[in-house]
């Protein structure tokens, strides 16, 4: 079980209360698909993903990026039981979708990068530490079914 300080809980809650899902989600998933092109294989039904421009302009990518960020809300609401919160999603991604669990970490890194770019200097080391801890716990929970 992960121990959360009151400060970490406050930081994570504050990030999500100000998060522009419609901006950060599409940018983060687009970045992941562009920087790590092998991740595109899981999105073959999304249409044209042949280059950066087509990925950035793809409505399916944007919608899924938003969905992913809203999926993080579940973890935020259940910070003391993140593993159980994502158990069904872990099973789906491992048994049906066959997503490489390393891809969760890649996407988490892209979310962090996009959020940092958006927040600028306000994205302090303390904020980054709490946010990345939260994402690491979610990534671990999503990968549980693979072990």
Curated annotation (Swiss-Prot):
GO terms for molecular function: haptoglobin binding; heme binding; metal ion binding; organic acid binding; oxygen binding; oxygen carrier activity; peroxidase activity. Heme b binds at residues 64, 93. Gene3D superfamilies: Globins. CDD domains: Hb-beta-like. Residues 3-147 form the Globin domain. InterPro entries: Globin (IPR000971), Globin-like_sf (IPR009050), Globin/Proto (IPR012292), Hemoglobin_b (IPR002337), Hemoglobin_oxygen_transport (IPR050056). Red blood cells. PROSITE patterns: GLOBIN. Heterotetramer of two alpha chains and two beta chains. Involved in oxygen transport from gills to the various peripheral tissues. Belongs to the globin family. This fish has five hemoglobins: Hb C, Hb O, Hb 1, Hb 2 and Hb 3. Hb 0 presents the strongest Bohr effect while Hb 1 presents the weakest Bohr effect. This is Hemoglobin subunit beta-1. It comes from Pagothenia borchgrevinki (Bald rockcod).
């Amino acid at each position: 079980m992960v121990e959360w300080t009151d400060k970490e809980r406050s930081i994570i809650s504050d990030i999500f209360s100000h998060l522009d899902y419609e901006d950060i989600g599409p940018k983060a998933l687009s970045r992941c698909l562009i920087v790590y092109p092998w991740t595109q294989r899981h999105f073959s039904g999304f249409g044209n993903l042949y280059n950066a421009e087509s990925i950035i302009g793809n409505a399916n990518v944007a919608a899924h990026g938003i969905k992913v960020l809203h999926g993080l809300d579940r973890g935020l609401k259940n910070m003391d039981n993140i593993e159980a919160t994502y158990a069904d999603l872990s099973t789906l991604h491992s048994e049906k979708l066959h997503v490489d669990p390393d891809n969760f970490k890649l996407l988490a890194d892209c979310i962090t990068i996009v959020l940092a770019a958006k927040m600028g200097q306000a994205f302090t080391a303390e904020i980054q530490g709490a946010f990345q801890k939260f994402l690491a716990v979610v990534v671990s929970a999503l990968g549980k079914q693979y072990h």
